[in-house]
């Protein structure tokens, strides 16, 4: 046992380490959580033994069938992308559970004591032998069985909490059923602003300039996850959009490798513009990129549309019409 003074000092040091480490992870807002869960569902439900049944379970916050590898890997995917599980450490991160609650507690219907219990439960799980889907799932299943309501609450899984957050943040966050592009346009080219006159050309792939355009491209590239929060390029995310419209991403990937190597900018907005120019200026890539970019605008309205059957099979002409309709609104 620690003597009282040493115990207090040790507790202070541990608390300080937790505080120091906290900024390395950012709590997740409803928009981020919707993106994470929908993306993990897209990746894993087709691999389930009964895809339709598994998807319905996951949409209802039920991690079933528990013996299906797809369910196990979906769970691991969500936990890793949120940050509640760190594969490199093979550990669950209880401190992040509390950080999630502390960041958003005024919106959440979650009791602090229950959140504290969940935090402690995570922290008491020893490092796993591996970060396999089955091992992560088995460890989490025991926690979820006892704390499922609290987990759902801190992850904005109850409608009223996310509704309050969206209402308070307004134009500062992409709203449900709002395309990511229109969100960024409302922030950077709002109606009545002097720069609004530039928006129509930008929507039609004319290159903008200045700090407003830089902020706009940063908003879009980070919102689409083409760039990470640390300003790193995620070329696989761009490739994913190419594949969805049945375009091969190989030429784009090779070109973007060179583009990244030539990057000299440090400012996030300038970095986004640099990457955008590369995609627009390469004659072998630009037409496919525009097609992929247009469809991503349409799909960004509802992250769950492809999962719930609301998204029609891809048709270039249908997408072009939808984008033209948006242009009419934004160019007026």
From Swiss-Prot:
S-S bridge residues: 40-77, 73-133, 184-219, 200-331, 259-278
Protein name: Long form salivary protein D7L2
PANTHER family, A to Z: GEO07291P1-RELATED, ODORANT BINDING PROTEIN-RELATED
Gene Ontology annotations for the cellular component aspect, listed alphabetically: extracellular space
CDD domains per the UniProt record, alphabetical: PBP_GOBP
Family, similarity comment: Belongs to the PBP/GOBP family.
Protein source organism: Aedes aegypti
Record's keyword annotation contains Signal: yes
InterPro entries for the chain: PBP/GOBP, PBP_GOBP_sf
